[in-house]
């Protein structure tokens, strides 16, 4: 018989740097999950992606055990990493902070593809381009 699910927790954490401090501790503590167990497992699985923010969906079961699924980093994080930016533009329609080539957009889209609701790489690229534009990044043809 399958275990009964009692909760789903969604968090965005620094890869390899999960600690029992907020936001991890309180989110897991209210479901009775072993916080240190999660932190060690998460840090071990994400050690190779240091510096990125990794979304994680934690499923908590009735016996207080848990499982989690790692997602790909948010598109904005990948764009900032590709361009070496600290943050996007405060006024994206006026101030541009950088520009991406089509090849860079395609690389980001291929990384994000498993988590995007896109049928083809072209539609995934359009989604990434939209995110880039809203951050004040121009797309070169």
Curated annotation (Swiss-Prot):
Q: What is this protein called?
A: Large ribosomal subunit protein uL11
Traced from the root, the source organism's taxonomic lineage reads:
Bacteria, Bacillati, Bacillota, Clostridia, Eubacteriales
Which species expresses this protein natively? Answer: Clostridium botulinum (strain Eklund 17B / Type B)
Q: Name one GO cellular component term.
A: cytosolic large ribosomal subunit
User: Mind listing the GO molecular function terms for this protein?
Assistant: large ribosomal subunit rRNA binding; structural constituent of ribosome
Q: Which InterPro entries match?
A: Ribosomal_uL11 (IPR000911), Ribosomal_uL11_bac-typ (IPR006519), Ribosomal_uL11_C (IPR020783), Ribosomal_uL11_C_sf (IPR036769), Ribosomal_uL11_CS (IPR020785), Ribosomal_uL11_N (IPR020784), Ribosomal_uL11_N_sf (IPR036796)
Family according to the record: Belongs to the universal ribosomal protein uL11 family.
PTM comment, free text: One or more lysine residues are methylated.
Q: What's in the keyword line of the UniProt record?
A: Methylation, Ribonucleoprotein, Ribosomal protein, RNA-binding, rRNA-binding
Biological process terms from the Gene Ontology for this record are:
translation
Note the Gene3D superfamilies from the entry. Answer: Ribosomal protein L11, C-terminal domain, Ribosomal protein L11/L12, N-terminal domain
Q: Describe the protein's quaternary organization and the partners it interacts with.
A: Part of the ribosomal stalk of the 50S ribosomal subunit. Interacts with L10 and the large rRNA to form the base of the stalk. L10 forms an elongated spine to which L12 dimers bind in a sequential fashion forming a multimeric L10(L12)X complex.
Biological role? Forms part of the ribosomal stalk which helps the ribosome interact with GTP-bound translation factors.
**Where on the tree of life does the source sit, at the highest rank?**
Bacteria
